[in-house]
């Protein structure tokens, strides 16, 4: 019986230097997919986190709630377009150590698995870009044309 070896990496903060969801939210605002008011709603929480008055998890929780609210009824093609832009730009901003470990595991023919709480349409693109064999992420449900605002 042969055994396969797998290396499991969390994307947000372990491979990538930040949260894919946060970068996608910023780009959705920049591309007018989300209204600018999202930034204003999040700003007090971001400032509180940056001033160490709020835990990062609380800041990220607020950001993800706003993200889920504003992705509802958005066109999947618009969201995907912005997702591609995020991955094109941000996929190079990786921790060197983690990038080297992924490379080493690939050379050893180990399976590479990515996990993330970020949206599946971002994680799948990052996984493809970095050659992961399998990935798990938050699923943002849609009907093929528009996002429902439901996450599993």
Per-region residue spans from a language model:
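A metal-dependent, Asp-based hydrolase signature
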Residues: 20-21, 33-104
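C-terminal cap/substrate-recognition subdomain and adjoining C-terminal extension
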Residues: 2-5, 81-82, 87-152
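Residue-level signal for pocket-adjacent positions within structured domains
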Residues: 10-11, 66, 135, 146
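Asp-based phosphoryl-transfer active-site loop
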Residues: 3-21
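Short, flexible active-site loop motifs that bind/organize anionic cofactors or intermediates
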Residues: 11, 69, 113
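Short, surface-exposed, low-complexity cationic segments
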Residues: 24-31
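Single-residue recognition of alpha-helix boundary sites
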Residues: 21-23, 127
């Amino acid at each position: 019986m042969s055994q396969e070896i797998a290396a499991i990496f969390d994307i947000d903060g372990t491979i990538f230097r930040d949260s894919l969801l946060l970068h996608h939210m910023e780009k959705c605002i920049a591309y007018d997919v989300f209204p600018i008011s999202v930034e204003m709603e999040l700003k007090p929480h971001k400032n509180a986190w940056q001033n160490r008055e709020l835990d990062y998890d609380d800041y990220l929780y607020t950001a993800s709630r706003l993200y889920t609210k504003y992705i509802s009824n958005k066109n999947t093609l618009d969201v995907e377009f912005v997702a591609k832009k995020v991955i094109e730009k941000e996929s190079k901003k990786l921790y060197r150590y983690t990038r080297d470990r992924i490379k080493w595991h690939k050379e050893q023919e180990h399976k590479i698995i990515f996990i993330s709480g970020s949206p599946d349409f971002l994680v799948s693109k990052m996984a493809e870009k970095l050659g992961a064999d399998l990935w798990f992420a938050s699923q943002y449900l849609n009907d093929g044309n528009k996002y429902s605002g439901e996450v599993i």
